[in-house]
């Protein structure tokens, strides 16, 4: 059994042995430590693998790269898997492997099935992943969808590479935005009784707020009703809603709490939170994005985690008091300015909550911690690394991945996505329009830090230009071949096909075999680099090669040996497409 990663390891071993021989001969000094990089060639005429080792060591050897390449090739031990080694260009070394090496890939794939490509590279290391974590103040919009698809794919890839992944959603159920949400629902509730009351312009405006308010009214009647006069009595006249709309909102929230009292305010607050959070959970689950835990911010206070973080920073000398507030000495750890932890009113800041939450993550003993943020959080990275140092934790365990928001276009018109304004396109609306598969694939087919203009028309099209359709169509085409087989008198003998894989000699077949052999390496690279787009691009290449093969050759032929070999080959292609799409959260339909 063989895969591309094994071949690369074998070639690396051969090169290391050659280098040691050259050291013994005095061509290279004993202290020379080579960094061997082996790549898969893009042109079969240049072999299957290549290395630039001679170019990187030529200075140390005191000779031209080409001359050193000749000596390296001369020093290579023989290998039964290598048929030819050639020197190309200024000193690249190209390796040609035996056809049998690639043909065994088919048997490996068909034997392993859905587990082909999985590895123990991660050795069971525990990884904590947090992604999406959108405030539960409204439905998820199309921007959140990219973080959801990306995070879910990275988690799947790490799991396939042998890591134990814990998926978590941090629920911001405390803080100012949640107070504004409760206020927005309450005002809409009051409008059911008092048409004259106006919703503050910076409150949440969406139709979903009205839906929550109507449900509240249906269940509780006038329990939360207060007259316009009683509310206005709580609003100081000097507060101008137009001059300072945010301060005006805060006064409204305070008035709501005073009038309702703790019990009724909590009832309104919880109704709003539960409604939106349940909607988010359902939306993500329908999108194929699931979590092991939904961690509420309120738990940080309830379990004393904020105080624990504050105590630890204080112990290490990074907390001081100024103007009645407690500050984190962030500038001592590389940040641009110090940060408030506890306000003078005694309430913790968002920053204090982040300190506590990350302390909690580190206390769980994970080997890696991954935060996936929107690109607008770029400036937050040095703050997090700073307070981790202040807590005495190892910042190198934390990996912060930034995802650019996707921009949705209808024709040439860019769609606004303002949550408070209520004029946004939800993730659910996008999914219903283009389908889960297109949404999942389009979100991850580019690097996460690249801007993504989501082309709605392309995502819906059934054409070769639509990458997810093109890949799924390859899978469906293979399924159709096997359905057609059942209508003929011909059979499919797998063992006989394995015995005759050497008959797969066309360029189309050689290309497919080589690409199939790369799959395990692609999974490892995509996992280690948190790069699901690498898998997406690989599947596009594989699908393109299959479609070319399908259009050029026939499969249900009279020659039993060649027919069985070809059916085994396309069955392996079918399996890899299905495996890869599954990791990306995309279905592999049997008919299209």
Curated annotation (Swiss-Prot):
It is an enzyme of class 6 (ligase). GO terms for cellular component: cytoplasm. It is found in: Cytoplasm. SUPFAM superfamilies: Anticodon-binding domain of a subclass of class I aminoacyl-tRNA synthetases, Arginyl-tRNA synthetase (ArgRS), N-terminal 'additional' domain, Nucleotidylyl transferase. Signal peptide: none annotated. HAMAP family: Arg_tRNA_synth. This is Arginine--tRNA ligase. It comes from Coxiella burnetii (strain RSA 493 / Nine Mile phase I). The lineage of its organism: Bacteria, Pseudomonadati, Pseudomonadota, Gammaproteobacteria, Legionellales.
């Amino acid at each position: 059994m063989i895969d591309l990663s094994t071949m690369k390891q074998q070639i690396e071993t051969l090169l290391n042995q050659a280098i040691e021989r050259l050291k013994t001969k005095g061509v290279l000094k004993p202290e020379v430590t080579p960094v061997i990089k082996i790549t898969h060639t893009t042109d079969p005429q240049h072999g299957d693998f290549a290395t630039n080792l001679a170019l990187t060591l030529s200075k140390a050897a005191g000779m031209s790269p080409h001359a050193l390449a000749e000596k390296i090739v001369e020093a290579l031990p023989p290998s039964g898997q290598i048929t030819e080694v050639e020197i190309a260009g200024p000193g690249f070394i190209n390796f040609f492997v035996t056809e049998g090496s690639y043909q065994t890939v088919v048997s490996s794939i068909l034997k392993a099935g859905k587990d082909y490509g999985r590895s123990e590279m991660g050795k069971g290391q525990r990884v904590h992943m947090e992604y999406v974590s959108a405030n539960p103040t409204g439905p998820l919009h199309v921007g959140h969808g990219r973080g959801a698809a990306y995070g879910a794919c990275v988690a799947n890839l790490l799991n396939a590479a042998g890591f134990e992944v814990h998926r978590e959603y941090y629920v911001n159920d405390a803080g100012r935005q949640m107070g504004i949400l409760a206020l927005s629902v309450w005002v809409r509730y009051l409008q059911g009784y008092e048409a004259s009351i106006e919703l503050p312009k910076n409150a949440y405006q969406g139709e979903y707020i009205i839906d929550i308010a109507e449900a509240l009214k249906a269940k509780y009647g006038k329990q939360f009703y207060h007259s316009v006069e009683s509310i206005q009595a709580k609003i100081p006249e000097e507060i101008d809603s137009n001059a300072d709309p945010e301060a005006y909102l805060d006064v409204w929230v305070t008035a709501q709490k005073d009038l309702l009292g703790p019990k009724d305010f909590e009832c309104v607050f919880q109704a709003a939170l539960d409604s939106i959070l349940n909607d988010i959970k359902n939306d993500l689950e329908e999108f194929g994005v699931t979590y092991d835990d939904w961690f509420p911010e309120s738990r940080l206070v309830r379990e004393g985690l904020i105080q624990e973080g504050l105590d630890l920073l204080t112990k290490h000398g990074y907390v001081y008091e100024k103007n009645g507030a407690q500050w984190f000495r962030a500038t001592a750890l590389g940040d641009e300015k110090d940060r408030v932890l506890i306000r003078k009113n005694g309430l913790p800041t968002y920053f204090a909550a982040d300190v506590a939450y990350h302390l909690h993550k580190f206390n769980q003993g994970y080997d890696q911690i991954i935060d996936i943020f929107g690109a607008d959080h770029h400036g937050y990275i040095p703050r997090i690394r700073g307070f981790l140092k202040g807590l005495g934790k190892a910042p190198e365990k934390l990996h912060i991945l930034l995802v650019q928001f996707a921009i949705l276009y209808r024709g040439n018109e860019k769609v606004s996505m303002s949550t408070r304004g209520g004029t946004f396109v939800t993730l659910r609306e996008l999914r219903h329009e283009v389908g889960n598969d297109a949404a999942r694939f389009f979100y991850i087919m580019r690097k996460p830090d690249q801007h993504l203009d989501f082309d709605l028309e392309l995502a819906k099209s059934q054409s070769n230009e639509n990458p997810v359709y093109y890949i799924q169509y390859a899978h469906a085409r293979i399924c159709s071949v096997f359905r057609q087989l059942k209508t003929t008198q011909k059979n499919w003998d797998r063992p006989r096909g394995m015995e005759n894989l050497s008959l797969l000699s066309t360029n189309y077949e050689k290309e497919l075999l080589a690409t199939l052999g790369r799959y395990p390496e692609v999974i490892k690279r995509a996992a280690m680099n948190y790069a699901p787009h690498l898998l997406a691009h690989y599947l596009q290449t594989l699908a393109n090669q299959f479609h070319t093969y399908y259009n050029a050759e026939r499969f249900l032929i009279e020659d039993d040996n060649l027919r069985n070999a070809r059916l085994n080959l396309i069955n392996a292609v079918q399996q890899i497409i299905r495996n890869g799409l599954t990791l990306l959260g995309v279905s592999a339909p049997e008919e299209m």
